[in-house]
Every structure is written in C-alpha cells, then in structure tokens.
Amino acid sequence: MKKILVIDDHPAVMEGTKTILETDSNLSVDCLSPEPSEQFIKQHDFSSYDLILMDLNLGGEVNGMELSKQILQENPHCKIIVYTGYEVEDYFEEAIRAGLHGAISKTESKEKITQYIYHVLNGEILVDFAYFKQLMTQQKTKPAPSSQKEQDVLTPRECLILQEVEKGFTNQEIADALHLSKRSIEYSLTSIFNKLNVGSRTEAVLIAKSDGVL
C-alpha cells in the first residue's frame, strides 16, 4: 500500500482526488489544507508519505512551490509532484529546479494521473516534452567532453553517488551504503551541482542522464 498526500486549499478538490485515486486498491490517500505558519512543516510528518501532490495556488500567503521547497529541506527524500489547474508547461522547469518530480494538470484523466504517480513511485521523473527538448538543445551547445575542463568532469565516486540519488535514497542512506560520512555525501553533491550547473538532485539526475553519465 502506497501512501499519498494531497495538499490543496479546496476541500472539494482534495476529496475528489482522494476518491479518484483510491479506486486503486494499492493507494491510500490523505488530504491536508496548508496553514500560513512557520510551524506547519514541523507539525506534520511528511516523511511517512510515498508521494505528495502539491497544489500551486494555495491561497493567502501560502505558495505551493515554496512550501514544496521547505518540505524538501526537512525531508530531502520526499517525492513531490505539482498538481495544478494552470498550464503545466509554465511551471515545469521551476518544479524540476526546485527538486520536485514533475507536474500534473488537474484536468488530466484519472488513468493518466494514476499512471504519472506510479512512474514517480518507481523512481522516475516526469519530464514535460517541451522542457526535455529545451534540455537537449542546451546539451548540443555544450563543448564536447574532450574539451571540457578536467575539474568539470564527474569523478567515479560522484557518478556512484548520483546513481544512488536516482534511486531516491537520502544522503544518510547513501552514506551508509557507500560506507562514507553523511557530510562527505553532502560535499560530493555540492560538487556535482556545481559541475553540472544545477540546483537540485532531480535536475542533476536529468542532466547526467542526458550527458550519458547515468
């Protein structure tokens, strides 16, 4: 049984989504309305959920993208998908850069939403086609590997760490698996981010895949 959390400021939307998703007997869905409080993150155990569907426009002072970033700061292994009534393409790049696993429109069919969720649960990232084309275009304009600066090439250890990141493991879990300290993993991830010119684990995996590193 996979636990899903829907965060939205409209009770009808939350309950409707819960009803739709729970037609799948393998999904258990909870709903939560956000509060404009600094204690909101600490009051809830987001780590107990396998995936979070996050609305963007939560009303008042609460912004779904910022709330997602705060949750990921406290729970870096959380898998979050933007769940919005707006055009997905307008927010996809920001979501990926923030470390989220993609974006889904609320207007999608029940089957497609469920399919997207299972993709993410299986460790995959939902990549909008327009954004993927943009990524590939950027990669074509980069220097060939032979002309890259030596310090910009990922080390074998960094590649190994990135492979563990792709599997969805936390820094501590990666440290335990590789018999390294958590601090060492954090330093390595900072180096990876700088070399790939990215700001999140999700984006690092995407770029590494497009470069053939993973």
UniProtKB/Swiss-Prot annotation:
The keyword Cytoplasm applies. Residues 3-121 form the Response regulatory domain. It comes from the Bacteria. Residues 171-190 bind DNA. SUPFAM superfamilies: C-terminal effector domain of the bipartite response regulators (SSF46894), CheY-like (SSF52172). InterPro entries: CheY-like_superfamily (IPR011006), Sig_transdc_resp-reg_C-effctor (IPR016032), Sig_transdc_resp-reg_receiver (IPR001789), Tscrpt_reg_LuxR_C (IPR000792), WalR-like (IPR039420), WH-like_DNA-bd_sf (IPR036388). Response regulator in the two-component regulatory system ComP/ComA involved in a major quorum response pathway that regulates the development of genetic competence. Regulates directly the expression of over 20 genes, including genes of the srfA operon, degQ, rapA, rapC, rapE, rapF, etc. Regulates indirectly, through the regulation of comK transcription, the expression of late competence genes. This is Transcriptional regulatory protein ComA. It comes from Bacillus subtilis (strain 168). The gene is comA.
